[in-house]
Regions:
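Gly/Pro-rich cap/lid or specificity-loop segments adjacent to the active site
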Residues: 1-118
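Alpha/beta-hydrolase fold active-site neighborhood
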Residues: 111-186
Length: 186
């Protein structure tokens, strides 16, 4: 476990920035870089500004602005409220989707539903799809997903493939492990 934790430390923003600065010093020691930071790149950009401000010409942040002085718990509380607001807006726009979501939840409680990879589909995984409602076009994407969920009384195989593809931790497992570390300060 200790070796694994040490290895994961290489994926933290400070480690990434130190690697990037080594590359910059090697390739263009006399030319500062310009950065564009989005999501985790925003956190890396802010870390770069903290550690090597003289190595940067300019930094553009489009997302991933660190909540300085705020804990991960505070960020999550604000995020939960935003997701709840987005869910209310989604169901107000697509009222029929609530009945489909309820039907899906009931179906998942009564049946052992498996995704194509063999993983069990749970109500909680289905609820996780609501986290994407902040993205552009997400309302329509989620509605179309729900709309195609059933063929008669059975779940549509195409629906199951789409849900599987939307499970971020299946394809990005390191995100789940490292996510909260981005909120550490000091």
């Amino acid at each position: 476990p200790g070796e694994q934790a040490d290895y994961l430390g290489h994926f933290r923003a400070d480690s990434i920035v130190r690697d990037a600065e080594y590359i910059r010093e090697t390739l263009s020691p006399d030319r500062p870089w310009s950065l564009l930071g989005q999501s985790f790149g925003g956190f890396c950009s802010l870390t770069y500004l903290s550690l090597f401000p003289g190595s940067l010409h300019e930094v553009y942040l489009t997302g991933g602005v660190a909540p300085i002085g705020r804990s991960a718990d505070e960020v999550y509380r604000a995020t939960y409220q935003r997701v709840a607001d987005k869910n209310r807006a989604f169901f107000a726009r697509f009222p029929h989707a609530q009945a489909i979501a309820n039907r899906l939840a009931n179906h998942l409680h009564r049946h052992d539903v498996r995704l194509p990879n063999g993983q069990r589909l749970t109500v909680e995984q289905l609820q996780h799809q609501g986290l994407d409602l902040g993205a552009s076009g997400a309302f329509e994407e989620l509605y179309y997903l729900l709309e195609d969920a059933f063929i008669g009384e059975k779940l549509n195989p195409a629906f199951l493939y789409k849900v599987q593809a939307m499970q971020p931790f299946n394809t990005n497992p390191v995100f789940a492990i490292l996510h909260e570390a981005i909120y550490c300060e000091g």
